[in-house]
């Protein structure tokens, strides 16, 4: 429940990994849905109620962030500096706030 309240994102239960390049930040308002079972593609962020400006920008395209699930292989991103953030699954279900 704590991890859900902290993130407040519409991420399904289970572990998920977000890859971000150093020129973008995937925290505060960038809530990405799972790409599974679809192909990995660039996703549009969703604004969360708990995120103040300027982090929270609805309808803003973030081309440098991907959300991966373990049913997808890691995309070939050679030559790009990446930072990996791992969001653990929640122990108990909670309501999404996005």
UniProtKB/Swiss-Prot annotation:
The sequence repeats are at 3-7, 8-12, 47-51, 55-59
Q: Which keywords annotate this record? A: Keratin, Repeat
Sorted alphabetically, the Gene Ontology cellular component annotations on this record are: cytosol; keratin filament
Q: Which domain of life, per UniProt?
A: Eukaryota
4 X 5 AA repeats of C-C-X(3): where is this region?
Answer: 3-59
List S-S links within the chain: none
Q: Name one GO molecular function term.
A: structural molecule activity
Q: Which family is this sequence assigned to?
A: Belongs to the KRTAP type 3 family.
Quote the subunit structure annotation. Interacts with hair keratins.
Q: What does this protein do?
A: In the hair cortex, hair keratin intermediate filaments are embedded in an interfilamentous matrix, consisting of hair keratin-associated proteins (KRTAP), which are essential for the formation of a rigid and resistant hair shaft through their extensive disulfide bond cross-linking with abundant cysteine residues of hair keratins. The matrix proteins include the high-sulfur and high-glycine-tyrosine keratins.
The protein in question is named Keratin-associated protein 3-1
Species this chain originates from: Homo sapiens
């Amino acid at each position: 429940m704590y991890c859900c309240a902290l993130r407040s994102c519409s991420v399904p239960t289970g572990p998920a990994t977000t890859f971000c390049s150093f020129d973008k930040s995937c925290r505060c308002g960038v809530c990405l849905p799972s790409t599974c079972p679809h192909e990995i593609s660039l996703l549009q962020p969703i604004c969360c109620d708990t995120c103040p400006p300027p982090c929270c920008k609805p309808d803003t395209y973030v081309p440098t962030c991907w959300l991966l699930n373990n049913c997808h292989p890691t995309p070939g991103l050679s030559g790009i500096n990446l930072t990996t953030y791992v969001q653990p699954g929640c122990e108990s279900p909670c309501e999404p706030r996005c």
